């Protein structure tokens, strides 16, 4: 999903089934995809039959800004960047409207009961992927975030302690890492 959609679209005020993508890291993929099928999916093309069998849903439009995947290992690494961003943005979108619209959310399907290629924060072998860390970052007790719709920077206090007199200092980088 486009991370901006988590900010722009209101869902149910208490949403008990939220989630996004979740391809595992390369080590996870090696455990169940035969070597001859370790082919990076190509945007808008039907994926390899093994990837299809394991329910891969294409999201290359979010991976390609990091550069077209050269191989399955490169794809898995870039997928982790997208996984992190998806779940961080998911929680930030909820936090942005918490108590104004939202009252809570629960992640649906944190893992898969089989070797699947979507909707998981940790795989069948209990190996976490970047979704888990993005979720944790977006849900941290004191979190600084930028609304991609209006560029407003907000500090969200998800903790139990009041926080006062805080200052945010931010620096912006482009996709090449230049400020």
Over which residues does each language-model region extend?
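Intrinsically disordered, low-complexity Pro/Gly/Ser/Thr-rich segments with frequent PxxP/GP/PP motifs
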Residues: 164-179
């Amino acid at each position: 999903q486009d991370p901006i959609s988590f900010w722009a679209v209101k869902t149910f005020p208490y949403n008990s089934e939220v989630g996004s993508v979740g391809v595992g890291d390369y080590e996870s993929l090696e455990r169940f995809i035969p070597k001859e099928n370790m082919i990076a999916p190509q945007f808008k093309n039907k994926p390899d039959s093994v990837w299809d069998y394991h329910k891969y849903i294409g999201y290359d439009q979010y991976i390609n800004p990091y550069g077209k995947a050269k191989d399955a290992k490169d794809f898995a690494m870039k997928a982790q960047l997208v996984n992190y961003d998806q779940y961080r943005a998911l929680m930030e979108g909820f936090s942005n409207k918490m108590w104004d619209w939202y009252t809570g959310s629960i992640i649906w399907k944190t893992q898969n009961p089989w070797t699947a290629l979507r909707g998981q924060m940790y795989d069948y072998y209990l190996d976490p992927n970047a979704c888990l860390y993005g979720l944790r970052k977006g849900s941290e007790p004191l979190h600084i975030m930028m609304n991609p719709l209006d560029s407003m920077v907000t500090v969200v206090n998800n903790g139990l302690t009041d926080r006062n007199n805080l200052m945010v200092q931010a620096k912006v980088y482009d996709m090449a890492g230049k400020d």
